[in-house]
Amino acid sequence: MRGEIDEANLAPETSLINKENQDSSATITTTLLLTTFVAVSGSFVFGSAIGYSSPVQSDLTKELNLSVAEYSLFGSILTIGAMIGAAMSGRIADMIGRRATMGFSEMFCILGWLAIYLSKVAIWLDVGRFLVGYGMGVFSFVVPVYIAEITPKGLRGGFTTVHQLLICLGVSVTYLLGSFIGWRILALIGMIPCVVQMMGLFVIPESPRWLAKVGKWEEFEIALQRLRGESADISYESNEIKDYTRRLTDLSEGSIVDLFQPQYAKSLVVGVGLMVLQQFGGVNGIAFYASSIFESAGVSSKIGMIAMVVVQIPMTTLGVLLMDKSGRRPLLLISATGTCIGCFLVGLSFSLQFVKQLSGDASYLALTGVLVYTGSFSLGMGGIPWVIMSEIFPIDIKGSAGSLVTVVSWVGSWIISFTFNFLMNWNPAGTFYVFATVCGATVIFVAKLVPETKGRTLEEIQYSIGYVEL
């Protein structure tokens, strides 16, 4: 049994230091921008993999003569690979470091895209898709954690949310390119951001907090100074990280079993709860049914998807800009409320289809609901759960906890993906009313349990959560 963390004893000795200079490093340096760009190249790969299957379905099935079952396996095996990658991601990142883990992930993605490009039979498509999915699963943990660990507290939320923005861009760019080029060339293009990141990893620093965790103190100082700028005073931040890390060395490395000790209860409930509510709030249902809804509204699916992109990217960008100004909680509350309204409108549109006088207006109500949901989800619920996941767990259990939270997210994604058609056959309106109820529950969950992490160091956040008795 691991020892319980005493919040008072973990309070940093550096708290007595004059704090006037602690924010002096909260500036955007060239190294910080470059490092973030390299990291989120992996997020773009993530988005490209998600967006690949939709535009290539027709050409791919015709050229390789795939059955419906074979193409369904090709689409779903990505999630299976991602679940396995997510389960292993935390331990890998703790063992070899955040930077090396991104390189490890990219090797799987490159091999996967290459296998898809060279495929002449279904089995190689599935192998390639599985490999890319595995890389995605690793990325979904390591990228937001790495960005959270390298950025100053005043910039951390916005920079970490760029992960979600690049996923959106990856999906959108791949979907648009897939409308004009063949599936093999699209797979080759998918390798470009992989190569960009692989090259960039040679010039960016490792996470200073991981270096401190493994006792590489000299490299820790060098990495932190590079990220904050050569003229920045890093003494307060450096001392706080060192003090916190040294006190945690008295505790053994956290495992999955250790996560269920009382002192981690609140962090676990918040991290897992946000991911469950995110996935069961209907995001995949909206995504899967969007084209049909657009067609029922008299809008072509291509124009409809472009409309979603037009809403999604600006709203995600707005979330990035507001993250460190308005805070995480207000954005989550607004976002969850908006997704609740969006799902309710879609559900209502299905209900009104049976009212003859209103059936024509119902399709436009569905279109409005989809766009309201998409914009609201992009503002907060899409990215903020990943930001909070990267902030609330202490370094000694971050690998195990992050893996658990990420696996929960992917399992939830698979459950909704698998059951959605069955739910729609059962009751289309009822399906979206259920999603609306989950989104409403998210508002209550955020209001009651989710802490505000804006403007606080990772160490301060973890002190404040403290010991929670179940």
Curated annotation (Swiss-Prot):
Please tell me one Gene Ontology term that the record gives under cellular component: membrane
Q: Where in the cell is it found?
A: Membrane
Q: So what family is this one in?
A: Belongs to the major facilitator superfamily. Sugar transporter (TC 2.A.1.1) family.
List the keywords (alphabetical).
Answer: Membrane, Sugar transport, Transmembrane, Transmembrane helix, Transport
Write down the species. Arabidopsis thaliana (Mouse-ear cress)
InterPro entries in the record = MFS_dom, MFS_ERD6/Tret1-like, MFS_sugar_transport-like, MFS_trans_sf, MFS_Trehalose_Transporter, Sugar/inositol_transpt, Sugar_transporter_CS
Q: Extract the NCBIfam families matched here.
A: SP
What this chain does, per the entry, is described as: Sugar transporter.
Q: Which GO terms describe its molecular function?
A: sugar transmembrane transporter activity
List residues traversing the bilayer.
32-52, 68-88, 107-127, 130-150, 162-182, 185-205, 268-288, 303-323, 330-350, 369-389, 404-424, 430-450
Its name, as the record gives it, is Sugar transporter ERD6-like 5
